[in-house]
Amino acid sequence: MYAVIRTGGKQYRVAPGDVLKIETAAANQDGQIEFSEVLAFSGETGSVVKPGAAKVLASVEGEGRGDKILVFHYKRKKQYKKLQGHRQNFTQIRIQEIQIDGNSYRAQ
């Protein structure tokens, strides 16, 4: 049983109990995040969901920064070199529950 959600401009396939790193997201006071943009849902029958019919609840486990990515610009014969680094911020979450049409699917 899984769902496909969209957050941070990316799509993720999630199931109850999954741990994943997403783009930095704001959580509630109690550390919960609710994803209401569910694109697809697979249960016993597997189906595409109507907008607003399903939601995914997750809890925040931590925040951090990803590995450094180096960007190197170089122009030959001109002695031009520029090195720049980038570390993307992320939020680590654990999927607690998938709710659709009054039914709730939780992690075992």
Swiss-Prot record:
<keyword id="KW-0694">RNA-binding</keyword>
<dbReference type="GO" id="GO:0005840">
    <property type="term" value="C:ribosome"/>
</dbReference>
<dbReference type="GO" id="GO:0005737">
    <property type="term" value="C:cytoplasm"/>
</dbReference>
<comment type="similarity">
    <text>Belongs to the bacterial ribosomal protein bL21 family.</text>
</comment>
<dbReference type="GO" id="GO:0019843">
    <property type="term" value="F:rRNA binding"/>
</dbReference>
<dbReference type="GO" id="GO:1990904">
    <property type="term" value="C:ribonucleoprotein complex"/>
</dbReference>
<keyword id="KW-0687">Ribonucleoprotein</keyword>
<dbReference type="Pfam" id="PF00829">
    <property type="entry name" value="Ribosomal_L21p"/>
</dbReference>
<dbReference type="InterPro" id="IPR001787">
    <property type="entry name" value="Ribosomal_bL21"/>
</dbReference>
<keyword id="KW-0699">rRNA-binding</keyword>
<keyword id="KW-0689">Ribosomal protein</keyword>
<dbReference type="GO" id="GO:0006412">
    <property type="term" value="P:translation"/>
</dbReference>
<comment type="function">
    <text>This protein binds to 23S rRNA in the presence of protein L20.</text>
</comment>
<dbReference type="InterPro" id="IPR028909">
    <property type="entry name" value="bL21-like"/>
</dbReference>
<dbReference type="InterPro" id="IPR036164">
    <property type="entry name" value="bL21-like_sf"/>
</dbReference>
<dbReference type="GO" id="GO:0003735">
    <property type="term" value="F:structural constituent of ribosome"/>
</dbReference>
<comment type="subunit">
    <text>Part of the 50S ribosomal subunit. Contacts protein L20.</text>
</comment>
<protein>
    <recommendedName>
        <fullName>Large ribosomal subunit protein bL21</fullName>
    </recommendedName>
</protein>
